[in-house]
Amino acid sequence: MLADGLSGPLPGGPFTGHALRHVCVGTAGPALLVVARPLTLALRLLPPGGVRRGLLRAAHSPPAAWLLLPPVAAVADVGGLWALYRTGLAAAAHHRPWLDGTLHLHKAAAGLLFGSAICQLDPVRRRRSTALRATTLLLAGTAHAVPAKTLYATGPPGTAFAAADLRAGAQVMYYGGDAVEVALALVLAVGWYTAAARDGPATPRGDGDSPPLTRAVPPRRWGSCR
């Protein structure tokens, strides 16, 4: 999906095609990659040795833990979106292929970082609480929806897209982003439910499972018989 989004023509007008590429590269593609657990897969495939230890050490390093803090990952993801569509960056990238490619790489990296911080399926240094991750996902979804709605009426500064093309692209970004955020919420909910079932208290035995109670009978002394 990332390769399809980065290469080849897409249906619709110029901005609609751009929006489809944005959804593939920046949201849907990274989300699918997060669910595939790339770090876990790499650790299983690599033989024991320096490369495997180095990868695990990098994943558990303080910088990685800081980048995987959900609010930090959300700012990197949503902040880039606002900078692209509410400044002259989109117009500049239209005339500079190297800048356009750099922005697509940033979208993919920021989307992967955000999805990893929310889902936390791979082994990380510190696992954040479900409440923090869910709240961050909700706020990031709201912040993502605002520029998508504003693009319905006003294009990025310095661009001149047709009104119909602009509206279609804005709808693709709005509903595509919502669909991916719902998928991330489902992954988060399944992880919370699984952890709660695994760490929950043991089920007490019912009355039917309890052993029968018997009254202790003192031993009979033969000398007391008459």
Give residue ranges: language-model regions:
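Alpha-helical membrane segments of multi-pass proteins
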Residues: 1-226
